[in-house]
A protein has these predicted regions:
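Acidic, metal/ion-coordinating pockets
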Residues: 29-353, 424-431
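C-terminal segment of classical bacterial N-terminal signal peptides
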Residues: 19-26
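Sec-dependent N-terminal signal peptides of Gram-positive bacterial secreted proteins and lipoproteins
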Residues: 14-17
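Bacterial N-terminal signal peptides that target proteins for export
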Residues: 2-12
């Protein structure tokens, strides 16, 4: 646990201007103002049970995190100061096998038991599609009917505790089309977002805000205005995530909502933002009315708060914090006098092995997850991909604790350029592709000279402790879903080297843009063992605004040829245009990797069995290749999305299981070195050496956004 106390100067106007030194507050016994405690609960990513973690002091702990440990910390904080708020910052209901195969419902009883005061949705809270999102988070919306593929995923919950009376699987069986009684669990806490709008896809018109932009809470006599800014990157994710919504960055809406909260008497303005640390720091610099910024999305950890000094002698400050994932709880004790911060104390509390699980929350989790682990309650589950008919999808039958591989080095995702976990993933995709005996559209056999793979720069993960560090090194099936909890399918597609290079340059620009408002997405991509990158991130390397960070790319030792066509083995997010693979558009000769279901063993409730990891594997073309998304067709009674990938198409976890059955994760094979930052990665301007993604980006100073108060669009 780290603590940072603040000492501020408060300007009091009387007959003379007086400067008064104010010491840092304690929760009790401080007389100069009123102290409220704000808790930052952030980026849970569906982590229900404890897991391994690496803490900022490099300590490796095998029993950390999980919502029940965080609940214990929340109770301890509440006991120390009754004047508190629990503020949840996004990406909560998505990120694990249990949440994927329940559309987030597995975590909802525990979340509803925490007494969250205000919730801000993150980009992955939209990951099950707009119908699930509206049912769960939009107050008063009980009429939205789940899509057939959604009902496939949650049909197993019919009649279980908390789902009494739910009818997702009856009447109608495989012929079911609509169920007004099929639903996901409703959140009992309010959501805020100034930048999320309802959108009529047919009329192409905004129809109002989805949530209130802010709420004002009276906490021990201090009125706190809590404003929400959800993630602005949802439109760049799978198309099915944002249908019926429109997102802005919130820049224009922010001053309006600040003024409205102030008009309701708010003395303290707290912004919950899923824009990421760099954007959020810039907002605090440009909007002096923001007192506290609880930042999310980028998974950074700030053991010490980032303080933005403004006003005379720095008397007006903005406090920016980010509290990692579920292994932490942020605590900010803040003292306010006449609408001014007179002191603060920030602690990044650690949910490590010394913190017990809250018994009541643990019992809720065990109830929701018992069908996923070995025992009498274990069953098969099915995730229905977008566009699939009811009763079809990706089948999970093995318990999540099943050991599926071994790692020598410790695995995590916490590096802006390259990670062992991503290297393993793309090597698994490539290995499967090369095993198929396929040829490309020109008749060339797929080899490591003409075939490659990439994976998105995801941040969600769990730490898997390796045998090199004295631990078992076991990789479980649940671990694999923590690294790939989305319902994509394996795909092969062809791109020119020039198209791939343009995409990679664009991603590097998104990650390292010197203008924080142009930073977006996750971290950089993962690439296969037959690839090598030299990238230049320093300020003086010649480049244009969008090109020039990549100095060299080789495939099997040969320089990438922009005119040559390569085969990319990667993922297809269901519902996207057919020519888009792994967020790279312009694909040709797209086909999907399909497996063979097991011939015996358990089935899901629809009679489906999981794919045989041993094969055989082959490819099939798209089921549909045009007009995949059509809101007019939907308005006339047809499907909003068409099925693209065939039945029995592979999931990335299938490729990983196949690969790990014959390969040990090893630093020599999967270690860092595929991406070489020739001049290094610059240290972050804000937040200290522990910040993974430099907040100022990397590149020429002339590309930066200058700090101008009251800047206009």
């Amino acid at each position: 646990m780290r603590s940072r106390k603040g000492k501020l100067y408060s300007c009091l106007l009387g007959s003379l201007l007086v400067l008064t030194t104010v010491s840092a507050p304690a929760v009790a016994g401080f007389s100069f103002g009123k102290t409220v405690t704000l808790m930052q609960f952030q980026d849970m990513h569906g982590h229900l049970a404890p897991h391994a973690e690496i803490f900022p002091d490099e300590r490796k702990d095998p029993n950390s995190g999980g919502i029940a440990k965080v609940a214990t910390l929340i109770k301890q904080v509440r006991a120390s100061n009754p004047n508190n708020l629990l503020l949840a910052v996004g990406d909560t209901t998505h990120g694990s096998a249990e949440t994927t195969f329940s559309l987030g419902d597995a975590i909802m009883p525990a979340l509803n038991a925490l007494a969250i005061d205000v919730f801000l949705p993150g980009n992955w809270d939209f990951g099950y599609g707009p119908r699930v999102y509206r049912q769960r988070f939009v107050a008063g919306d009980y009429s939205t009917v789940l899509a057939p593929n959604n009902r496939t995923t949650v049909a197993w919950m019919d009649g279980r505790p908390g789902h009494e009376g739910q009818q997702c699987n009856t009447p109608g069986g495989l012929n079911a089309t609509t169920y007004a009684t099929c639903h996901v669990t409703k959140a009992n806490f309010p959501a805020v977002a100034i930048n999320l709008y309802n959108y009529n896809e047919v009329a192409r018109a905004i129809t109002g805000q989805t949530h209130p932009g802010y709420l004002v809470k009276n906490v021990g006599g201090v009125k706190v205005g809590i404003i929400g800014i959800t993630s602005d990157v949802v439109p760049q994710q799978a198309q099915a995530f944002n249908t019926g919504f429109r997102f802005t960055m919130g820049y224009k809406e922010l001053p309006v909502n600040i003024a409205a909260a102030r008009a309701e008497g708010a003395e303290l303005i707290v912004v919950l933002s899923e824009l990421g640390l760099a954007k959020n720091i810039q907002l605090v610099r440009e909007f002096p009315a923001i007192n506290v910024m609880f930042s999310g999305h980028t998974h950074e950890r700030t053991p010490e708060p980032i303080i933005i000094k403004r006003g005379l002698f720095g008397s007006n400050i903005g406090i920016v914090t980010e509290a990692g994932e579920d292994s932490f709880l942020g605590r900010l004790d803040i003292t306010v006098y006449r609408g001014r911060i007179t002191g603060y104390n920030w602690q990044l509390l650690e949910a490590d092995s010394s913190v017990p699980e809250d018994p009541a929350i643990k019992a809720l989790i065990e109830q929701e997850t018992k069908t996923f682990v070995a025992g009498p309650d274990h069953i098969c589950h099915t995730f229905g991909p977008n566009g699939f008919p009811f009763g079809k999808g990706h089948v999970l039958c093995d318990p999540l604790e099943t050991v599926v591989g071994h790692t020598n080095p410790t695995i995590e995702r916490f590096n802006v350029l390259e990670e062992v976990a991503n290297n393993v993933m793309v090597d698994a995709f490539l290995d499967l592709a090369l095993s198929l005996g396929e040829t490309d559209s020109r008749g060339n056999l797929l080899t490591s000279d003409n075939t490659l793979s990439q994976t998105n720069g995801f941040r969600f993960d769990v730490v898997v402790l390796g045998s090199d560090d004295g631990f078992s090194g076991d990789i479980t099936l649940g671990d694999l879903y923590d690294y790939y909890p989305i319902g994509a399918t394996g795909a092969l597609a062809e791109f020119t080297g020039g198209r791939l290079m343009d995409h990679w340059e664009g991603v590097l620009t998104n990650v390292f843009d010197p203008n924080p408002y142009r930073q977006r997405g996750g971290w950089f991509l993962g690439f296969t063992h037959n690839m090598h990158f030299d990238v230049e991130l320093n300020d003086d390397f010649p480049r244009t605004i969008t090109q020039g960070r990549i100095d060299l790319v080789t495939i099997n030792g040969k320089k990438l040829d922009k005119s040559t066509t390569y085969t990319l083995a990667s993922c297809y997010p269901h519902g996207n245009p057919v020519d888009e693979v792994c967020r790279t558009t312009g694909a040709t000769n797209v086909r999907y990797v399909v497996g063979t279901p097991l011939g015996s063993g358990p089935t899901d409730m629809f009679g489906n069995r999981p794919l045989n990891i041993s094969g055989p594997w082959y490819t099939q073309p798209p089921v549909n290749s045009a007009n995949i998304f059509d809101p007019v067709r939907f308005a006339n009674g047809g499907p909003l999305f068409l099925q693209v990938a065939p039945f029995n198409s592979s999931h990335p976890v299938d490729a990983l299981r196949r690969y790990l059955a014959t390969h040990v994760v090893d630093a020599g094979t999967h270690g860092l070195g595929r991406i070489n930052a020739v001049t290094g990665i610059p240290a972050s301007e804000y937040g200290g050496p522990g910040i993974v993604q430099p907040t100022q980006g990397a590149g020429p100073a002339w590309l930066k956004r200058e700090f101008v108060l009251f800047d206009k669009d």
